[in-house]
């Protein structure tokens, strides 16, 4: 064993061994318990960042730990390789997205190998390959045949100058990123999958996800948004037209003083034909930002359509207003407005001089709506002559009474609604999987026949930054179906499609079908899934939805795709900037910032860069290109080794919390590995050891062995049950401190050190696998560490021969005594009373009572 710890040599050697022996390639084996560990696969952007490294290190630690439990462990990797960044890079670099993507995959693959992640590379997938998206296209056609796919018009960002659709990321301050033209909203036909058909199951099955974070489950419940209410019909005065409104607060219906409809509602469009003010308002609404955040912040505006609605219970007329806070694609596109009991309605009514009527009062007081709406549930009053029996009812009683009345008159019905909308999967981009639908010459729309799949995306293209190459190339869309001329769909799939089923494809990545059911059902569900909480409501919901679709088509037999979910926190780093001559912020890398002053708590006060600019320190923030505060993993591995980077990542913070990057702490992790290496080297250099004779150990040796086996138990529990990897590492570090001070004089001292080091190396193997691999060999083992089991706790070693008892007099500490572990109260009392500190404080006093807490405390009450 070499004396010096040389990570670059060790890691290259061990990684070559793993590659040569295909250590992490696995097949189905019914005789072994399986464990499927999966980290969310990366987008091949060009280089790994520290967020990737944290995610994949956590996954690798879990996978390697489970391997040492004797399980058949699958840990695959691949590339989420379609998407807009590749198009933008292709435009900037005057190339096609495909070569840029494949070059990035090659580079990042080498980075992943450099970090020592134990992936089964034989299962590698890239979602941009026809071998992958062929089966996504096939699956879509099956969903269409089952009635789960439909086409309807939906709003998109449209650049009138370039005549092209823009992704949200390409809209900057309301303008096109390329030509700065004002972006407008345009309705175009798009494909949707009926996720709403599964809304109830998706919601109810959240209760099965016992090992998912509560925060993620709450976010999904809120996103699905189940509500119980009443849908009621309002007639339009002087017309046979009507419209429906859904409300979860039917108890307030007697307080409706106006109705608000979306600018895109047919009634608003119709009224605008003779109302230029309304027509102008509708045009203004077309170009509004309709994201939730924007809707919440925007000024609430509206225009009276001139139409009146007939209240379904009172028969009174209420005005119909077009309002910018109602969306046509949400609910029915119309809401009943009760300003007395809804704050938004209150502010709108106040602004436009509309009546405000109170019909709900607190159960224990008077109603006051002079300054704001009363929005709580309470007791109904002021219900009027048309339905006086509502007065005095509480919410539920009123709900039932109003439901009964509307149902009997055919004007409404009780209904369960969901906030969740169907999934629009069309994207007017090039770099995505073509949607496998065709339109025949006679206008018939149908799926691409199975024998024509995959519909291959041409990769040899030129990106002009304006139009998708497959939209620009009219010949590409032309095809033949059943002897007829047909035209292919030129939209591509939302890239969430690819990431919704990749986990299942890993089970049989080379199968000539979407999934091999036998293999999929061996590996699925995923036992441990790891990724960021930012995916809670999109990817993780589609991921669950697709699994249910796969189940219902007969490809898998489980209800949920993943048993356990860990959402790792972000990686933060110091961020610095200076302001240039034009007043713009120039962000400076932490590597180029020299701290010149700190306060008494060590916080940065002043810093300069290498060119002398005085820097503003903004604190720790998420590593990002925009703030130039990313740390290149390659640099850190070159400087300290992969094991050091991995150890720091796992030790610096609990996995679900943010991790603050501090190079001084990285250096600390490196020093710890060097200490371990030195301890092992010093031990090995003294030659072979004799067998450990537990029966002959003295008390100090027994105590050290007890600490060893306590540590084995704690580390296993911390990794498997608690997933507190940082405390597991801290326990090993504490044990290491004990081992470094342990005597090495006798044969049994060295035999005990051999047992301890063999255990420590296995405890650390999931975290620092290269170092552990090498040390395991150095400790005299022929079999490689991947093929051995996690150390077993010797329960007999945990049994203590003696106990330390705290001795108090009148509740104050006066002595500590060591007694036999099985000592009774009388023995402990005698030992305690003999202590000098106890004698001093009981002398001349009468002992009134002796309280003994077995194995812990003796309290003598004397006065």
Swiss-Prot record:
Protein name: Leucine--tRNA ligase
Enzyme Commission code(s) on record: 6.1.1.4
GO cellular component, one term: cytosol
Motif ('KMSKS' region): 622-626
Catalytic activity: tRNA(Leu) + L-leucine + ATP = L-leucyl-tRNA(Leu) + AMP + diphosphate
UniProt subcellular location: Cytoplasm
UniProt keywords, alphabetically: Aminoacyl-tRNA synthetase, ATP-binding, Cytoplasm, Ligase, Nucleotide-binding, Protein biosynthesis
Organism: Shewanella loihica (strain ATCC BAA-1088 / PV-4)
Family, as annotated: Belongs to the class-I aminoacyl-tRNA synthetase family.
